[in-house]
A protein has these predicted regions:
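N-terminal capping/small domains of soluble enzymes
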Residues: 1-78, 163
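Hydrophobic faces of well-ordered beta-strands that scaffold small-molecule active sites
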Residues: 7-13, 30-39, 56-60, 123-129, ...
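Glycine-rich tight-turn/loop motif centered on a GG-T
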Residues: 30, 73-98, 176-179, 231-247
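Active-site beta->alpha loop and helix N-cap motifs at the rims of alpha/beta catalytic domains
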Residues: 52-55, 62-163, 167
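Generic structural signal for well-ordered alpha-helices
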Residues: 100-112, 141-145, 168, 189, ...
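Active-site-adjacent beta->alpha loops and helix N-cap segments on the catalytic face
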Residues: 135-140, 158-172, 185-196, 282-283, ...
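Catalytic alpha/beta core domains of metabolic enzymes, predominantly
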Residues: 177-323
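C-terminal extensions of enzymes
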Residues: 317-388
Length: 388
């Protein structure tokens, strides 16, 4: 964080599991590291003094929300049972939705201190619209409005589909904070930047209160390289791609988007998620997703598993500003021979209707939808146990 005053670190999971996770980490720690680790974890987030946290915000998604159920099943079961008492004729889909909203509300409440102390600059928690409706503009808007009403520090996660950018523009025009997710390629990232800018202009023209408004644009970095067609197309073209080359491909997209957003005066902030401890070179582990982007006015959002890996593999790593350093020309030239990357790297590489069928988006949306169904199944079992 010392590499840029605007650099932020967020918690990529529900705040409701932080104590469980940190407690489990301490139980596994070697005795000689226990004191140091306890201080590190308290510095990241202290439930007694959340306003002093190193974490300045929170991102969640369906798989991460499902983790809350797995980590605190009896706790969530009680929430579900209480909601059934209040809504006796509810069906399983409606019960899932009110349960999800309650998890979002409680998590946001844990960061209200950060939100208020920072004068509404930090302390946002991202609540996501149902990934199963990523092409339904009206349903996404309806869900977004419900989520936004839960707490002033709830930021709405909206997918990078063609319809999603229409939703982002609308929400921005109403002064509602957004986080663009399921985003992998430059055409998506810039479509979001433009939608936010246009929506903000409408909001200002209409005198909308923007006191609690903020926008971030997420790049699901390693998901671009790992879930799509990058390696397959390279292999078919007989182009040898190393692990480092794949990481450079992801970084090239992020760095270019960052430059365009910063130089274009767009009101959004770039956020990186889906980071990996990678590459491994000459037996040494690196995390280029952290190292090569250090010095940027950006957000890094880190899930529990990634934080554990950083503690284990990167202890003592010194960071220096590298955000403005270019991708090596030989690597970029090789990558640009691959259509999957070439389209991802150019602002007009994909038309908006092509966003919905991008391989990384389809794979991620499928995974997130399956996790959502997992939450529905959980509440359905509680419903069946009560109603027979």
């Amino acid at each position: 964080m010392e590499t840029h005053p605007g650099l932020e670190i967020w918690w990529d999971s529900s705040p409701l599991i932080y104590s469980n996770w940190s407690g489990g980490l301490l139980k596994k720690a070697a005795p000689d590291r226990l004191g140091e680790l306890r201080e590190q974890l308290k510095r990241l987030y202290d439930p007694e003094h959340p306003e002093m946290a190193l974490f300045r915000g929170v991102t969640t998604n369906p798989p991460l929300s499902l983790q809350v159920i797995k980590a605190r099943e009896s706790f969530v079961a009680q929430i579900v049972d209480d909601l059934m008492e209040k809504n006796p004729c509810i069906d399983k889909e409606a019960l899932f939705w009110v349960t999800y909203k309650e998890i979002v509300r409680r998590g946001a409440e844990m960061y209200l201190g950060v939100f208020q102390r920072s004068q509404y600059r930090y302390g946002y928690l991202s609540g996501q619209v149902d990934p199963r409706v990523l092409t339904d503009k009206e349903k996404m808007i309806a869900q977004a409005l419900e989520l936004a009403s839960l707490s002033p520090n709830v930021m709405i996660k909206v997918p990078g589909s063609k319809q999603g950018y229409e939703v982002i523009k609308f929400l921005t025009s109403k002064g509602i904070s957004t986080n663009n997710t399921l985003t992998f390629v430059l055409p998506q990232l810039m479509a979001c930047a433009k939608a936010v800018k246009e929506g903000l202009e409408i909001a200002k023209q209409n005198g909308v209160d923007l006191t609690h408004w903020r926008s971030v644009i997420t790049h699901m970095t390693a998901r671009y390289g790992d879930l799509g067609d990058l390696r397959r197309e390279a292999e078919s073209l007989k182009i040898d791609l190393s692990e480092a080359d794949v990481r450079w491909a992801e970084l090239a997209i992020f760095k270019k988007a960052y430059r365009l957003v910063e130089k274009g005066g767009y009101p959004s902030k770039m956020l990186i998620c889906s980071m990996r401890i990678s590459p491994i070179m000459n037996g040494k582990k690196y995390c280029w997703h952290l190292e090569k982007l250090a010095g940027g006015n950006i957000v890094f959002t880190c899930p529990p598993s990634f934080i554990e890996a950083v503690f284990e593999s990167l202890d003592g790593t010194e960071f220096r500003p590298q955000i403005d350093e270019e991708v090596p020309k030989t690597v970029l030239d090789k990558l640009l021979r691959i259509p999957y990357f070439e389209k991802a790297y150019h602002e007009d590489g994909l038309a908006p209707h092509e966003f919905n069928t991008h391989p990384a988006l389809v794979a991620t949306a499928t995974e997130f939808s399956k996790a959502t169904e997992g939450m529905v199944d959980f509440v359905a079992k509680r419903l069946a146990a009560k109603c027979g």
